[in-house]
Amino acid sequence: MKEKLLMGNEAIGLGALHAGVGFVFGYPGTPSTEILETVAKNKGEGVYVEWSVNEKAAIEAAAGAAYAGARSMVTMKQVGLNVASDPLMSLTYVGVKGGMVVVVADDPGPISSQTEQDTRHFAEFAKLPVFDPSSPEEAYQMIGDAFALSEQLGTPVLFRPTTRVCHGCVSLQMEDCSKRITPEGFIKDASRWVIFPRLTYQNHQKIEA
């Protein structure tokens, strides 16, 4: 165990690496930017990191990795979820195989954004679980739980740190190692991945249950 002084965004990035994330996609925007940067600086061999052209492209790329059984993460600020909402809503119905966490950093105030939005309303709208850490310590601990819950339920999970969580600094005790997860790979199966028309109705019943 090592003790490190970390910004909340750094804690999220390192927590994702320690949880075995294999693919990270994002679009920069305060207060979320340092999460992907931290992963890029600290990643080991076999971890893919990408600044995507926009949030929609980022979430679609992460979904592809999760379909193959890898743990994937997307990072963006709150207004970016507006751009990514189309694939997010479809993912609710399709589901995932590997853990997929969509980190959306909210900016109450707003302090550095054009609007104030609450991602928890998006989670309710999409019928997705949401983690809402209240401190950098909780963010580090919860990110691994978010991947585990995503795999347990077979659905993406939203993760909502706010500006003060993202940019607050704390001293954290953490493991100095990352979990290694080897994805099974994508298995072509029309009954599992072709959502329309039959699976749309079936999965709608599960979502609304």
Model-identified regions with their sequence ranges:
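Thiamine diphosphate
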Residues: 1-136, 141, 162-165, 178-179
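Flexible, low-complexity linker and terminal segments
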Residues: 2-9, 133-209
